[in-house]
Amino acid sequence: GGFYWMTNRAGSIKIDAKILYGHSFAIYSLSEYTLATGDIRGIEYAEKIFDLIQKYCADTHFGGYFEMFERNWKLKGHGAAGGDRKTLDVHMHLMEAFTTLYECSGKEVHRRKLVEIIALIIDKILHPEFRTGIPQFFADWKIAPQIKFDIIWGWDRFSEDGSKGQAEDNTSYGHNVEFAWLLMYALDLLNLPLKKYINIIQKQYDHALAHGIDWEYGGVFVEGSHAGGV
């Protein structure tokens, strides 16, 4: 079950791995398809993917989700293979996917998993002082130096040899603002009070405005230190 990571335009499989990042967008897009068209096949497939994720990806010991798997859902190896890492990027987009899934299905299990992942991101993934996103963790949620995975979708964040400057102190300005927006959307859908989270959201926006904007040439820097700077 699930989706291959990559095919060519003719449909031939190029990379047969099962990557949680891709499955989060499958849930999101299929749920949105049903919301837009009324065609129930979208939500039916989205729920099947959700069930696969809970079966194969959920870490029932430390919480959160593993992210990188072989075709048969065997967890990939350590290091660049990504099997021992958990990331803000994937968990943020799972939150986004669970939001739209719950919006479409209205099922309690989808609401519960959405509430759980919001709490996990805030408690484990955001910096305790600056409330900015920490990119990578080991399975037990100890902060991990940011490395380049074998399968990746953000090539601009690393040098050609895969190294990362300030690998233990960097945060993505774009991800922080994106998370804040997605969180507000999820809270509205869940009918939960924004007041409880407004300080976190405000810190993330203020941090991005103060340190992430290139006021000289325009645009947004990719990332910088949690304390500020590029």
Region spans (language model):
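Glycan-recognition and catalytic cores of secretory/periplasmic carbohydrate-active enzymes
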Residues: 1-230
